[in-house]
Structure formats: structure tokens, C-alpha cells
């Protein structure tokens, strides 16, 4: 008799995705981040659900309800900080996952890559709206500044912003709708993850060499289930270190002050994982130009597959592209640092140079390096 996991209509989907899935024999730890992102999403949905049981999305009580969660709810402080720092872990894994895709040429799986970009936007939107919910100073002013960017859209901008706000400023209506969207989006993300995996399993995983591995596959279980389990353990360890020893390390102290529309904080800045995009936005003196650069800083990922000029898929055997890739990583770290600095000399100039370098590497230098490497192959 055939095993039930191979015959049962539901179980066989799980079987083909997580157990009997043929996987390349040489995928490295960089391939762990997909499953780690799944773990992060589950942690966020679970902790978020328990937070939503005690949270109230009203401007008068939102801040107090978060205080109540931390002080009065059993292990409420733990749930709250797991959720807040879980978001940071989520973005660390996301950026590693995208970086892996760029380095090893995984973007040639177009459908998988494009769904991934949609997922990235959805997670960023969810994180932004979640940051507004505690209704602290940075929540309020962050929401005001970022939603205001849409007013740069010609003709319909101002109307659009007021429509999103549900009034003439960020107020009760805004908070309530942000809570509703923040609750529903993770489930939409979970559905998109299924589609992401569906497209991935049409082709099978890429591998570090970038060479088809059809002749050398191994079953996902037990080899990669145990490898993923190790990744889970390391992620949870890191998250717990953060939550239990310095839960406010990545947060902003301004968010412990209740929102006050009459008092603007000296430095309005988003959470650390948006700082690179914020730096690109600020480095352009024109409002619409800045907004376009902000959107393009992420949307540029959609152009990457069409800029692939190399005869090889992966960067494993392409030293010039490797150097450019790591300069790009350093550039993103520089932008992240600049995004958290005040708008004054020399930070303005550093930000502008780093922004130009970011777009130049992706749009010009990497394709050129690929063409040079193609020539070197013939020597």
C-alpha cells in the first residue's frame, strides 16, 4: 500500500513541497532564508494576533492599550517585543534573501522573482502601518511624513492623501484603517508566499554554481529539513537575545512619548530597515523626484533580470561582478547610516554620492562588468 502522504489530496501537496521535493545537492546556507522568512511570518502573525486581542485602534486609547499590554497582560511585554523585533529579523532575512537572489542569478526565474518583489512591497507596507499603531510621536509623524509624499503625485496628489487619511490630517480614521490593513495584509502575504513557492517548484531551486542540477538532486527531507531546523534555532536565538536583553535597541525613544500633533520631533526617521530608501528620498532636493527615486530604489529589482548580460548565471565565477556586488552592499549600509543622520553637511553630500552610486552600480556598472567578463572568457 502506498504511503498516505503520497496519495492524500492535501498531504501530497505538503509532500511535494517539503518532503519528497528534489533539491540541488550543493545549496548553501544562503538558501536557508526562504524558510526563515516563513518562520518570521508565522511568528509575526501569531504574536500580532495576541496583540490585537488587547489593542484598541482609537487615538485616545491606542498608546495606553500598548502600555497596558506591556504592564498588565501576562507576558504581554514578551509578545510585544517579539513582534517589534520579529519585524527586524524579518527584514534582515528579506534583504539577505534578495541579496542571495542577485548574487547567484536567481532572478532569471521571472515569475518567482516578480512575486518576490510584490511580497517585498507588501511586507514594507505592512511594517510601515504597524509602526503607526502604538501612536507614539514617531508613529504619528512618520505616518504624516510618508503619507504626505503621495501629495507629490501631479493633479490627484492632495486629494489622494486626504482620501488615505480619511480627513485633513492623520487622525482617528487613519489609525483605524491602518490597523485594519495591518491585520489583513499578512494573510495576503501568506497567500502570495504560496504562489511564490508554486512558481519556484515549477523550475526547482537554483544553486550556487548557477549550473542546472537536474542530474544531481537529493530529497528535501531529511537533508534540508534538518538544515532549516538549524537555521530556525539560530534565528530564534538571535531574536531572543534581542528581545530579552535589549528590546529597545532598534526602536526610537520618541515613540515612548504619546503622539502630539502640536510638537514635531527634532529628527523624523523610520525604523532602521527603511533608512536606506529614506536616505535616497532625502538626497534629491525635489519632492516628486525624491518620491520617484524612493519607489525606484526597490522597483529597480524588477529591471535586474533584463540587465543580465553575462553568459554565466551566478557570480560565483565572476570576480569583477563580485567586487561590484560587495560595493553595492557597502553602499546600502552607508545609505542606512545616512538615513539616520540629520540633514546637514557632510551627510547630505555623502547621501547624494551613495544614492548615485546605488543606481549606477545596478544600471550601468554591473552590466558593463558582465560584458567584460564575457570577453575574458574567450582569452
UniProtKB/Swiss-Prot annotation:
Record's keyword terms, sorted: Electron transport, Heme, Iron, Membrane, Metal-binding, Mitochondrion, Mitochondrion inner membrane, Respiratory chain, Transmembrane, Transmembrane helix, Transport, Ubiquinone
Binding site for a ubiquinone: 201
Compartment annotation: Mitochondrion inner membrane
Membrane topology: Multi-pass membrane protein
Lineage: superkingdom: Eukaryota
Protein task: Component of the ubiquinol-cytochrome c reductase complex (complex III or cytochrome b-c1 complex) that is part of the mitochondrial respiratory chain. The b-c1 complex mediates electron transfer from ubiquinol to cytochrome c. Contributes to the generation of a proton gradient across the mitochondrial membrane that is then used for ATP synthesis.
Additional remarks: Heme 1 (or BL or b562) is low-potential and absorbs at about 562 nm, and heme 2 (or BH or b566) is high-potential and absorbs at about 566 nm.
Subunit relationships: The cytochrome bc1 complex contains 11 subunits: 3 respiratory subunits (MT-CYB, CYC1 and UQCRFS1), 2 core proteins (UQCRC1 and UQCRC2) and 6 low-molecular weight proteins (UQCRH/QCR6, UQCRB/QCR7, UQCRQ/QCR8, UQCR10/QCR9, UQCR11/QCR10 and a cleavage product of UQCRFS1). This cytochrome bc1 complex then forms a dimer.
Protein name stated in the entry: Cytochrome b
Source organism (scientific name): Lepus europaeus
Taxonomic path: Eukaryota, Metazoa, Chordata, Craniata, Vertebrata
Gene: MT-CYB
